[in-house]
Design a protein with these regions (language model features):
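Conserved ABC ATPase "signature" region
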Residues: 87, 96-113
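Conserved ABC ATPase signature
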Residues: 117-121
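Conserved catalytic motifs of ABC-family nucleotide-binding domains
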Residues: 138
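Catalytic Walker B motif of ABC-type/P-loop ATPase nucleotide-binding domains
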Residues: 142-145
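Short, charged/small-residue-rich alpha-helical element at the C-terminal edge
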Residues: 213-281
Length: 281
């Protein structure tokens, strides 16, 4: 366990931003923290990183825990080069390893624009530098507050391939908030938040299984309903909670009786809408 909270609550006057939130972050996990705008995501990160005090509740940290944060808005200087920005930040730490910083530069792929001013970089390049800055002190836990917002799909994939590599090679634990739900599809632990309340939690697969089961719709030639199916219109029937192998098995066994079929694999987006009644935009 790296961080655990119990009854975490934050009020701004009469407004309740967080309401009795219980969170546990275990080492090596990808933790996805999802919610619409104003749900309380950034408030939670600010509290967990010590930038904001909770109104009530307790937070337990692992001994000697090191934390890195990639904020929505960069904290680096647009007028300094990438190299100067990183080395200036590195010197703020008591124990600064030049070897580790050079390794980071290679690992994250920012060597080509080290001598460019930070303010002249593309969105994806800036984000990579922001991640490097957050990893200078070799943190155990990296908080990412909507790290790919505003980036195109290709750049988002580059950033996520990088983060997965860091998690695998460095044993990094990641706490993620995001507007792109596909980035949370493989989360080890997920929390879905709305109006400061946690509505659902579990692994991504558990959340999908409970709130967004896959559906197979079939049209049978003889209009005979398959076992455990639900009857729809136009001689169609629906079967829930089948995984891919079960779908293939069913279609193979009944291929002579099936006129048409449609398979919808449940997603985090489906689960999110089911839980909150809203789309994440």
């Amino acid at each position: 366990m790296l961080i655990e909270t119990y009854g975490l609550t934050k009020k701004y006057g009469k407004k309740l931003a967080l309401n009795n939130v219980d969170i546990k972050i275990d080492r090596g996990q990808l933790v996805a923290y999802l919610g619409t705008n104003g749900a309380g995501k950034s408030t939670t990160i600010n509290i967990l990183t010590g930038l904001l005090k909770p109104t009530s509740g307790t937070i337990t940290y692992a001994p000697n825990l090191k934390i890195g944060v990639v904020f929505q808005d960069s904290v680096l200087d647009n007028n300094l080069t990438v190299k100067d920005n990183l080395y200036l930040r590195a010197k703020m730490y008591k124990t600064f390893s030049k070897d580790w910083l050079e390794q980071l530069i290679e690992l994250i792929g920012i060597k080509k624009f080290l001598n460019q001013k930070y303010g002249t970089l593309s969105g994806g390049q800036r984000r990579r530098v922001d991640i490097a800055r957050a990893l200078i002190d070799h943190p155990d836990l990296l908080f990412l507050d909507e790290p790919t917002t505003g980036l195109d799909l290709q750049t988002r994939l580059v950033i996520w391939n990088l983060l997965q590599k860091l998690q695998k090679q460095q044993g990094l634990t990641i706490f993620l908030t995001t507007h792109y739900l596909e980035e949370a599809e493989n989360a080890d632990q997920m929390y879905i938040l709305e109006n400061g309340n946690i509505l659902a939690k579990g692994s991504a697969s558990q959340i999908k299984e409970k709130y967004a089961p896959s559906k197979l719709r079939v049209k049978m030639k003889d209009n005979k309903p398959p076992l455990h199916s639900k009857t729809l219109k136009d001689n169609k029937f629906e079967l829930d909670a089948l995984d891919s192998s079960q779908v293939i098995d069913f279609l193979t066994k009944n291929k002579n009786q099936i006129e048409d079929f449609e398979y919808h694999k449940g997603s985090i987006n489906d689960a999110f809408i089911k839980i909150t009644g809203k789309e994440l935009q």
